[in-house]
């Protein structure tokens, strides 16, 4: 039976009926629909609409629906997850099941279910991001004070600790967690009681319903509550930024795994071979992370475009906001799991990376800094060291291999302290500012990252 058949005298066109159904995908919301229905039933009993016996029958029926799931969603007459639950409840509990829809609308139901889903996915995604951060911290600790080149414009820039590079990604993922936490605050409001658009005709205690479902409070406006999908856009956009960060890291790992760089060895459990070339070991896991991040961006855009011109309040277009949310959540979770596994399995060729950090004139900035400490204005120091690099390039040697006479001819007074300042440990130690790559600063950053990670775990425990 349709939920709205009384006003109609003709049946739906069969093709349209099948085409407009959402149950094949919104059955993912079944647990949340059952939970929200249980809270609504409890509120109906509190308002005197249901007796305690009727409430018990409805709750027993809902529990059975939750246990059974929706293994067969092929009945073309069942439109969506809301219709499915109500129909099954009537089958299980009898006529009392028809009372459940008193004072509510599918408009508020889907808004509630989707908020519950987003909240759950935020919590799971946060835990998985934290695991990626934990893997980065583990690897940062494992490489000690080994160095590597940093890059700007994909050209060698200055030496940094490998740990400093890994912690750069940890910082990105920490920001992702704060974005999700911020999104969760706005998502965690309860639309139930808003009904179709103007509010319910039953004297329901909306604050009580919100508490039953773990929401912070009821929504403030029934028109907005039934048409708001800002929380979904924010969620998917937050996931798209996570995807960007995962993609950037994957791209660097792909580059660093090439023979030309040789900085890391791909773990076999996260690589594949070639059907044609026997020697190949391909970074498929990383390439898929990089490629699938595009889908997260596309889903975010799809949501925004779907909603951009909708009048208030609910419109059927909003049915099309669900699948981008589901797809983004599932894809992002998979990408995070794969990335954490890869990070724990990858082998860094620290000797190769450390050697690379000592070549390519990456101590030029340190040399200029040394001259500044001797009282030479930076712009002049920059010019002098630039000339020294030019000479070293012509001589096919490193900056620190130029003789004192070579440097004197350029106007640089070079003694033992100058050459000492160009050695890798001194170059790294020179960056002794908060957030810099000096070993003591990186050690401090590692401790801070671990403390932040512990705090995130404690917050998640409270949320759960």
From Swiss-Prot:
Question: Known catalysed reaction(s)?
Answer: 2-(N(omega)-L-arginino)succinate = fumarate + L-arginine
Protein name listed in UniProt: Argininosuccinate lyase
Tell me where it resides: Cytoplasm
Family membership:
Belongs to the lyase 1 family. Argininosuccinate lyase subfamily.
Q: What gene name is listed for this protein?
A: argH
Source species, domain of life: Bacteria
Alphabetic keyword roster? Amino-acid biosynthesis, Arginine biosynthesis, Cytoplasm, Lyase
Pathway as given in its UniProt record: Amino-acid biosynthesis; L-arginine biosynthesis; L-arginine from L-ornithine and carbamoyl phosphate: step 3/3
Q: Which InterPro entries match?
A: Arg_succ_lyase_C (IPR029419), Argininosuccinate_lyase (IPR009049), Fumarase/histidase_N (IPR024083), Fumarate_lyase_CS (IPR020557), Fumarate_lyase_fam (IPR000362), Fumarate_lyase_N (IPR022761), L-Aspartase-like (IPR008948)
Asked whether the UniProt record includes rRNA-binding among its keywords, one would answer no
- Assigned EC number: 4.3.2.1
Give the NCBIfam families listed for this entry: argH
């Amino acid at each position: 039976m349709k939920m709205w058949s009384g006003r109609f005298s003709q049946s739906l066109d069969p093709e349209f009926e099948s085409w407009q159904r959402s149950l094949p995908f919104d059955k993912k919301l079944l647990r949340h629909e059952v939970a929200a229905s249980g809270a609504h039933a409890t509120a109906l009993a509190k308002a005197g609409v249901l007796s305690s016996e009727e409430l018990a029958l409805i709750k027993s029926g809902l529990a059975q629906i939750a246990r059974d799931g929706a293994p067969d969603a092929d009945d073309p007459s069942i439109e969506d997850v809301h219709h499915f639950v109500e129909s099954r409840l009537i089958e299980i509990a009898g006529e009392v099941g028809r009372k459940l829809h008193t004072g509510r609308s599918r408009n508020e139901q889907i808004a509630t279910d989707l908020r519950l889903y987003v909240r759950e996915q935020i919590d799971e995604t946060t835990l998985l991001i934290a695991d990626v951060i934990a893997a980065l911290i583990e690897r940062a600790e494992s490489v000690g004070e080994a160095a590597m080149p940093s890059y700007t414009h994909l050209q060698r820039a200055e030496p940094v600790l490998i740990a400093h590079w890994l912690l750069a990604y940890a910082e990105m993922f920490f920001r992702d967690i704060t974005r999700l936490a911020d999104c969760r605050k706005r998502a965690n409001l309860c639309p139930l009681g808003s009904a179709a658009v103007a509010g319910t005709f039953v004297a329901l205690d909306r604050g009580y319903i919100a508490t039953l479902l773990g929401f912070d409070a009821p929504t403030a406006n029934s028109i907005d509550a039934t048409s708001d999908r800002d929380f979904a856009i924010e969620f998917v956009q937050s996931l798209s930024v996570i995807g960007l960060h995962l993609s950037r890291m994957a791209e660097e790992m792909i580059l660093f795994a090439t023979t030309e760089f040789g900085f890391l060895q791909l773990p076999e459990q996260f690589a594949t071979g070639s059907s044609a070339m026997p020697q190949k070991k391909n970074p498929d896991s990383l390439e898929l992370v990089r490629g699938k991040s595009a889908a997260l961006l596309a889903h975010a855009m799809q949501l925004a475009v779907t909603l951009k011109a909708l009048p208030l309040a609910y419109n059927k277009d909003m049915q099309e906001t669900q699948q981008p949310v589901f797809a983004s959540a599932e894809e992002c979770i998979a990408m995070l799991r794969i990335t954490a596994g890869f990070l724990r399995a990858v082998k860094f060729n620290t000797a190769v990376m450390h050697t690379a950090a000592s070549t390519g004139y990456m101590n030029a900035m340190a040399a200029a800094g040394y001259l500044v400490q001797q009282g030479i204005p930076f712009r002049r120091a920059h010019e002098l060291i630039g000339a020294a690099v030019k000479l070293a390039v012509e001589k096919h040697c490193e900056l620190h291999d130029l003789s004192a006479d070579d440097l004197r001819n350029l106007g640089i007074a070079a003694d033992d302290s100058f050459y000492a300042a160009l050695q890798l440990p001194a170059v790294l130690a020179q960056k002794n500012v908060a957030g810099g790559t000096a070993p003591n600063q990186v050690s401090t950053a590692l401790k801070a990252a671990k403390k932040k990670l512990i705090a995130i775990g404690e917050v998640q425990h409270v949320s759960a």
